[in-house]
Amino acid sequence: MRIVLAVCVVVLLAGCNRYSFDRQLDHAYEAYERGECETVILLLSKAERNSRSRRYMQPEISLLRGQCLERQALFVDALQTYQFIVTHYPASEYAYRARARMETLRQLRHAVGDAAVKVTPVKP
C-alpha cells in the first residue's frame, strides 16, 4: 500500500511541475502579445529553469527570446539566439523559423556580419 501511495505522490508532483512550466510559457506568450518584453524574458528564464529535463522545449523558449530581443532592437543578440537554435537543434521546426528570422534581419541590414553571430557548439 505504501508503494502505491508513494507512486501516486510522485505522479502528482510531476504533473504539478509540468503545469507550472506550461503556465509560465503561456504567460510569456501573453506578455509578448502585450509587448512586455522584460516580463517575457523573466518568464522565459523561469520556464527554462523548470524545463532542464525537457530539452525539447529549449528551441521554443529561445525563439521567443530572440523575437523579444528583436523588439528591443538588440539585433546582434537576437541573431546569436537564432544561431544557437540552428546550431543545437538543426532538424527542428524552430531552426527553420530561426533561419527565416536571420534572413529577414540580414535583408533589413540589421546583421553586422557572419562574424558577429558565430556561435560555437557546447557539448553537454
Where are these regions (language model features)?
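Short solvent-exposed coil/turn linkers within tandem alpha-helical repeat scaffolds
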Residues: E48-M57, V86-A100
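Terminal, low-structured helical/coil segments at or just beyond the last alpha-helical repeat
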Residues: Y96-P124
